[in-house]
């Protein structure tokens, strides 16, 4: 895991941090919000392993002082998902994984996932915070 306010290079996985000023709603006395950017290899179709990895990264980021952790596009399912998006069981598996992630406290998580409804499948992001 690296803590680097100016890094944008990919590594073997971990969390990079950046700070931004916030007018309101900051969780700390400085008025800053610290963002963690998760970089890791998420396995295509392995929602359980990806969920476990995301939990570990979120907890690690929180312990290093992050207020928000941002995961990559479709991190929950892995990229590129290809024909996995056509499976009827996908929606239920994704909802279960998001529910499992939502119980992590004291950090906001932005999680890329495929949202399925009667209009189709959409590349989406969930914002999870304290359940």
Identify the meaning behind each predicted range.
Residues 1-130:
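Hydrophobic structural segments
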């Amino acid at each position: 895991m690296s803590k680097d306010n100016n890094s944008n290079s990919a590594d073997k996985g971990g969390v990079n941090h950046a700070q931004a000023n916030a007018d309101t709603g900051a969780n700390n006395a400085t008025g800053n919000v610290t963002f963690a950017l998760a970089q890791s290899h998420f396995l295509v179709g392995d929602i359980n392993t990806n969920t476990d990895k995301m939990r570990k990264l979120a907890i690690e980021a929180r312990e290093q002082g992050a207020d928000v952790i941002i995961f990559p596009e479709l991190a929950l399912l892995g990229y590129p998902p290809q024909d996995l998006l056509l499976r009827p069981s996908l929606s239920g598996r994704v909802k279960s994984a998001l529910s499992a992630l939502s119980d992590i406290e004291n950090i906001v998580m932005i999680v890329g996932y495929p949202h399925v409804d009667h209009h189709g499948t959409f590349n989406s992001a969930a914002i999870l915070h304290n359940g």
